[in-house]
């Protein structure tokens, strides 16, 4: 390919940072189905805060980066990158509709000699078995004859300002040896820490899904330990610190597993494994355990309130944070909602405060109304406070000041506070 022109399809948490970075080296167009999203980006603001206004405006003004909803704007591109979500349905089965839709989009614009690279997290085989046949059907072109493909799994960590996209080492792959070299070269040209070229697309797909599945299993183990030690009256954090004194101990903390990656991706591999007659018992058990942690936390809070003589049905409870992780507006699959749901079985007096979350989106997605009170207005009102998300904004607060009296309960989900000021934690 003499002159590469890139189109990134999907401008969310993954696609936008990647497209912005590509634009510093190549002519780049960002494509998204949402006109409001495109309008906001072209006005120089990213509501996900993954790309700063300064960097986004620089890309638009100085590097010719544009965002669009129009197919004609990406027809003259020759290197298509698909970065759309891969969710699960209500039964935790892989939902490939976003990928099929993006593949149809590619099929409408791809030309002979072009390359399409998928970044979405999938089970091994999705790119070649599910996506490329759609591109072939819509375009009328033949895969690996008229057009070619690659896979380079995304490794974006929402809200992480240290491990940004340009600093993350990327796995790459291609449908032929020559295409693999081209794909690897394109990514290598924008990354500080380079790439790892996998021998096949399926290997690259598998590498990403086990990254997230491994973390899910490891956290599930820590959550199980937390349940055991809490029942025994032993502080889990103390145990972890002691065990960490050994050089090869993997230091992880218990916690809620939400978001669009770790809590979703294992289901893709679990389903595909069953097609081959393999039942992934460890991954399945990890998913069940982690999915139940919100309910567990809520019940721990109720027990502590009863123990301290706080009448649950009459008390007010404050949930600090609702996003799935700290310092990030992403509310997808947040497990704080599970805490809220279980607590609401005991009392209707629950206030939820989060300086990062969009109140309208929270209400639309979960039917939960965020309080519009300031932190100052919330002080001295509650029988229990659950610190659910470790936003920096909460670290400087006197959390006990939100309690109505000394009998109130502080539960620290994230292990952020000193033990002297809390009544319980994972």
What are these regions, as identified by a protein language model?
Residues 1-426:
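Structural/interface elements that position substrates and couple domains in central-metabolism enzymes
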């Amino acid at each position: 390919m003499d002159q590469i022109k890139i189109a990134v399809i999907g401008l969310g948490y993954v696609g936008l940072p990647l497209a912005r970075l590509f634009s510093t080296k190549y002519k780049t167009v960002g494509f998204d189905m949402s006109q409001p999203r495109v309008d906001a980006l072209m006005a120089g603001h990213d509501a996900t805060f993954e790309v700063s206004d300064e960097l986004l405006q620089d890309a638009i003004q100085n590097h010719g980066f544009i965002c669009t909803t129009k197919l004609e704007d990406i027809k003259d591109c020759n290197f298509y990158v698909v970065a759309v979500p891969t969710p699960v349905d209500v039964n935790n089965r892989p939902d490939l509709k976003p990928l099929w839709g993006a593949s149809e989009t590619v099929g409408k614009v791809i030309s002979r000699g072009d390359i399409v690279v998928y970044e979405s997290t999938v089970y091994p085989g999705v790119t070649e078995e599910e996506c490329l046949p759609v591109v072939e059907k819509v375009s009328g072109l033949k895969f690996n004859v008229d057009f070619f493909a690659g896979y380079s799994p995304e490794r974006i960590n929402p809200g992480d300002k240290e491990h940004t996209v340009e600093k993350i080492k990327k796995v790459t792959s291609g449908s032929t040896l020559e295409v693999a070299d081209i794909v690897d070269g394109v990514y290598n040209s924008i990354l500080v820490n380079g790439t790892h070229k996998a021998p096949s697309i399926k290997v690259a797909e598998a590498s990403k899904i086990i990254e997230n599945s491994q973390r899910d299993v490891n956290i599930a183990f820590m959550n199980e330990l937390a349940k055991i030690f809490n029942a025994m009256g032993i502080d889990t954090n103390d145990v972890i610190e002691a065990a960490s004194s050994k050089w090869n101990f993997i230091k992880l903390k218990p916690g809620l597993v939400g978001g669009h990656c770790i809590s979703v991706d294992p289901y893709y591999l679990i389903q595909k494994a069953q097609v081959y007659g393999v039942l992934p018992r460890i991954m399945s058990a990890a998913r069940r355990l982690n999915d139940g942690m919100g309910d567990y936390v809520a019940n721990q809070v109720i027990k502590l309130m009863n123990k301290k003589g706080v009448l649950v049905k009459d008390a007010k409870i404050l949930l600090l944070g609702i996003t799935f992780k700290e310092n990030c507006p992403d509310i997808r699959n947040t497990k704080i909602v599970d805490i809220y749901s279980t607590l609401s079985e005991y009392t209707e007096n629950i206030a939820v405060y989060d300086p990062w979350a969009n109140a309208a989106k929270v209400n639309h997605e979960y039917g939960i109304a965020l309080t519009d009170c300031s932190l100052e207005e919330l002080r001295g009102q509650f029988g229990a406070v659950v610190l659910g998300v470790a936003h920096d904004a909460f670290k400087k607060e006197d959390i006990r000041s939100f309690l109505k009296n000394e009998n109130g309960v502080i539960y620290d989900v994230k292990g952020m506070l000193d033990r002297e000021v809390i009544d319980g934690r994972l």
